[in-house]
Amino acid sequence: MSVSAFNRRWAAVILEALTRHGVRHVCIAPGSRSTPLTLAAAENPAFIHHTHFDERGLGHLALGLAKASKQPVAVIVTSGTAVANLYPALIEAGLTGEKLILLTADRPPELIDCGANQAIRQAGIFASHPSQTLSLPRPTQDIPARWLVSTIDNALAMLHAGALHINCPFAEPLYGDMNDTGLVWQQRLGDWWQDEKPWLREARRRESDKQRDWFFWRQKRGVVVAGRMSAEEGKKVAQWAQTLGWPLIGDVLSQTGQPLPCADLWLGNAKAVTELQQAQIVVQLGSSLTGKRLLQWQATCEPEEYWVIDNIEGRLDPAHHRGRRLVAKIADWLELHPAEKRKPWCVEIPRLAELAWQRVVAQRDTFGEAQLAHRIRDYLPEQGQLFVGNSLVVRLIDALSQLPAGYPVYSNRGASGIDGLLSTAAGVQRASAKSTLAIVGDLSALYDLNALALLRQVSAPFVLIVVNNNGGQIFSLLPTPQSKRERFYLMPQNVHFDHAAAMFNLRYHRPENWEELELALASAWRTPATTLIELVVNETDGAQTLQQLLAQVSHL
């Protein structure tokens, strides 16, 4: 019997089973122990293959692919610390709902805890963070192929959101010519190999029913809070709220068009908070809210009912309101709960939103970080998409900009880390093949710098704007000790990104005014290549501008 040949047949069943559940993208890191999985993926024509030498970046690449494709994405890595490097992307997927299937090669059981090289305890390594975990046995013909395929099918059928970790031990030899070893074992699956359906099909109904008292609540004074959702859902939510006459507080990720812009500014005004206290019901569609003032209001508001609608399971309400947690796709829920045409009940908030917007517009000519956030709408590629980084930049865009309704916006706002942002953006672009504008801070870019390798080949124009304010200026907004702030919080690195762009053969610009930025963008959108645009800005102006605007709007 050829161990290497049967390893490959075992792996081929696993990979073929994935195709029956919508997996088309497979992300592969180099490794020896993962050879059976890698070769099975390489030989399966149903897959689009992506490779990267860094497993942490590979996991985030898969995360971006899953975000844009809305399909599960597979990841193949070898044993050892390669597995642990998938942890950040797995955690993010668990919080934002993207489906990742992590195929981790492993040493066989007899090589664990005995000093064997590159052998760690991989079973259960991710603790409670995966939605599903599957520890397969060592490949053996004593286990029928139908057990293997039905086990994979069952795990994928139960995967509603987040990651499925499949640990796959393989014994040596890992290399060798294919022969007939295991062919009969494999052929016992019959015409399944020519079919397109799973071996085991399970129907799972889990969406919330129609709320029968909706006709009663839609006649009340309500507020709509829009969190993370798809572009199509964002447009529908905006129309739904407008028909109801309810104010819509739209997060930067809501894609609703934010009809009441600058919410994170005007929510700091006591008049707005007082008017919102009249709301009898708050309907929150989507999770992952960004704005600090929005989160503060959400934590203190006390409507009669607080409903949270999201396709992800779990509470999703850190304020623990009395109300309803409804698990459903937002578009489906809106269809079951139509709006009734009513006049707007809020008067003060639209006025405050307009005045706040005017204050922001008055400062747009200065070349700086806050002004870029406000202007970002003008720089979006036509028929394209936006990827927003974390820390200060996403807060500035949320507070100071008004993105178009239905324009695709992506980010990693689950755990909200700055790791893997460039890799995630690369995955979003690969899955959608759209022109992409990504904007991150300098520390975020440094953290994921080797992901620039993923941006060397793109199918459409990709612009990466690195806002270089020399450190983690988000901490300037927090009451960090002044004497310790620079060394222990901001950590300025005093670097520029021209050499990084050159190392990966990317186009590079460092504009010093708006005209130069617009010329660089105009050139970038004409070519299917990556352009890195570094905006060197005053270190503290972005945070200070936000604080000044908050103070101004609070006294309107």
UniProtKB/Swiss-Prot annotation:
Report the Gene3D superfamilies cross-referenced here. Answer: 3.40.50.970, TPP-binding domain
Q: Does Metal-binding appear among the keywords? A: yes
Q: Which enzyme class, named as a word? A: transferase
Catalytic activity, reaction form:
isochorismate + 2-oxoglutarate + H(+) = 5-enolpyruvoyl-6-hydroxy-2-succinyl-cyclohex-3-ene-1-carboxylate + CO2
What's one GO MF term for it? magnesium ion binding
Q: What is its EC number?
A: 2.2.1.9
Give me the comment on cofactor binding: Binds 1 thiamine pyrophosphate per subunit.
**Which keywords does this Swiss-Prot/TrEMBL entry list?**
Magnesium, Manganese, Menaquinone biosynthesis, Metal-binding, Thiamine pyrophosphate, Transferase
Task: Output the InterPro entries linked to this UniProt entry.
Answer: MenaQ_synth_MenD (IPR004433), MenD_middle (IPR032264), THDP-binding (IPR029061), Thiamin_PyroP_enz_TPP-bd_dom (IPR012001), TPP_enzyme_TPP-bd (IPR011766)
The answer on whether this UniProt entry bears the keyword Manganese reads yes
Q: Which cofactor does it need?
A: Mg(2+); Mn(2+); thiamine diphosphate
Q: Name one GO biological process term.
A: menaquinone biosynthetic process
According to UniProt, this protein's pathway is: Quinol/quinone metabolism; 1,4-dihydroxy-2-naphthoate biosynthesis; 1,4-dihydroxy-2-naphthoate from chorismate: step 2/7; Quinol/quinone metabolism; menaquinone biosynthesis
Assembly description: Homodimer.
Briefly state the protein's biological role: Catalyzes the thiamine diphosphate-dependent decarboxylation of 2-oxoglutarate and the subsequent addition of the resulting succinic semialdehyde-thiamine pyrophosphate anion to isochorismate to yield 2-succinyl-5-enolpyruvyl-6-hydroxy-3-cyclohexene-1-carboxylate (SEPHCHC).
Q: Which HAMAP family match?
A: MenD
The family classification in the record reads: Belongs to the TPP enzyme family. MenD subfamily.
- The protein in question is named 2-succinyl-5-enolpyruvyl-6-hydroxy-3-cyclohexene-1-carboxylate synthase
The source organism is Salmonella arizonae (strain ATCC BAA-731 / CDC346-86 / RSK2980)
